[in-house]
């Protein structure tokens, strides 16, 4: 039972049906009067994501102030079923019963997230969706998508095609990263992949149906080796010739954008323009961690920038860069978040 004119409740009903049909073989019709009721209330005591789940003899009622609460109530309901409910095939001989209960629940924290690093190890679009399913099952509501790093640039930027033509691919390696053989001369870069902007839109829609926000991370100014391989003019000294396989230690290969070059800020403007247009969330994560400043210390352009901006040291140069990224994102209607 639900308001069939509410598209969000209808979406949750379809989600619930998809979760139970494979294992049980039951087809549960969506009707105006049924034994499972999704009910929205004006009572704000449950908060935006809280719910009340009542399991009675022959009836199940989930009450919430917002559709997100109904969705989380469904997660609890699914967890009360026998574990065979997770099967993708019909399970015979299972007693599909739920114990009677009266549960009132709401989250303690508004931001409940997990990160997935798709740079060091490539995950396909379908694998990302499975990860989002796991977040939703545990009532997580933020997916932090670590899209770029030294070992691969995973997001299509249409104005900068080499980021994915070159930066998304490396030599195939497995094992402990510090024990990996470096890429050999002439070796093909066959490991990797990237998400087209259409792929991202599909993932965003999938996440929204599960009440999961998606926060993209573009890790700069450090952790930028893959970007420097694609666009070597953005390096302070000499950009690496190949995307990292993970065999180098911090500071060995140049992996930091040159903050002394105006071209770096033009590059970031192009990247963040497309990121801001693609991702609907108010936040964009720019990393900012583990920025090796030894390259800046030796770079005449970075030293000139420090002098021109009256910056005392390379730490202040990084702060200068971060502030410029914040202003850039603000101009695009976004807020900066970082490590």
Give the role of each language-model region:
Residues 117-150:
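A conserved hydrophobic secondary-structure block that centers on an alpha-helix together
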